[in-house]
Swiss-Prot record:
It is an enzyme of class 5 (isomerase). This is Trigger factor. Residues 172-257 form the PPIase FKBP-type domain. Transmembrane segments: none annotated. It comes from Burkholderia ambifaria (strain ATCC BAA-244 / DSM 16087 / CCUG 44356 / LMG 19182 / AMMD) (Burkholderia cepacia (strain AMMD)). GO terms for molecular function: peptidyl-prolyl cis-trans isomerase activity; protein folding chaperone; ribosome binding. The lineage of its organism: Bacteria, Pseudomonadati, Pseudomonadota, Betaproteobacteria, Burkholderiales. NCBIfam families: tig. Signal peptide: none annotated. It catalyses: [protein]-peptidylproline (omega=180) = [protein]-peptidylproline (omega=0). Its EC number is 5.2.1.8.
Amino acid sequence: MANVVENLGKLERRVTISLPKDTVQKEIDARIQKLAKNVRMPGFRPGKVPLKMVAQQYSGQVEAEVLSDKIGQEFFTISRAENLRVAGQPSFEPKQEQAEDAYAFDATFEVYPEVKIGDLATAEVERSTTSIGDAEIDRTLDILRKQRVHYHARGEAGEHGDGGADTAAKDGDRVTVDFVGKIDDVAFQGGTAEDFPFVLGEGRMLPEFETAALGLKVGEQRTFDLKFPDDYHGKDVAGKTAQFTVTMKKIEWPHLPEIDAEFAKSLGIEDGDLTKMRAEIKENLEREAKRRTQSIVKNQVMDALLKISELDVPKALIEQDQQRLVEMARQDLAQRGVPNAKDAPIPAEMFAEQAERRVKLGLVLAELVKANGLEAKPEQIRAEVDEFAKSYEDPKEVVRWYYSNQQRLAEMEAFVVESNVVDFVLGKAKVTDKEVSFEALASASSQA
């Protein structure tokens, strides 16, 4: 008899599964007989427990297992016979009306949607481009110099000078202070510290605190009011005004290393050649710019594809992805050292919108890849692995590391497929190139 698949909505379907009771009972009997060979009961040797006693104790459990297995097998058979593309897991419920000779269940499930991708020629993509010149190299060198900063006591003569005649604390100085904070003349937790170091101008402290420390000399103190922001992380003091007294203990001025051969050697240029150093920095910046522009344009392409595509999204797939995102969030918390992160109460609902986008995009990409032969080729995967390995000291070891793990290789394959999709769409869409600075590019990619 043909199976009747009921249409319950856009993607929801239902089919009735019928299992002959005699077939189910035969399987139950067979499993109980097998179980009896090993079951243990007080007063009986192993394997010598009467079959009737085994059946009395285990028949309910065995029946549930057999029904679960049979239902799953029958649903699989029906889905293949009816060419059903089932999305997610079906739910099974006993029918209210049961025949005498068969078990009857309703299987409710969702199917994959039809994906309609519009005309790619109507898609609009803004492609960021950037060029690396001397200004970008100089800015990078400034950052590298600041990462290697040394501090020296202000006013004390040393190898690099004394920091100038003015010994008051200035922007960029590392200062060490004692401070006492009170709210309504009562000290509060975290409001008092001794020998507390921070760099003026880095923004680690609240603006009022930094302003109060600026201009002080060693031994001087200043009392000032500080209003904590309403959204301050310390809830006990958020929105309140405290009175602080800060005492300057030490002032150290920053000394940045000169850009010379020694500096170049510290960056890995063995012979200290400054021209080689700048060339290597430029190469690294160009590689980073390429990576960031690829990331930004990929997001632009994905957004464009979603705008021109029509499809219904299976709820089951969204729920599965929500749970996947919850687990990813817990893993992230665990890596940050948060206690009991694996049991953190993270509501799946907070990922509903993100999960729907991910699932929808996955369905669109799968359709586009299948329709246009955009699967990753082995040589493409190897080329990307080689490119990635270039930035490491031992590229061959990185390549071996990739190819020794199927999961890592699968991630690279997914990256190549996405790149194929991006290139394919860019070849057909309305693309506008926009020149941006490296700093703007970095900011845009961090927000993407």
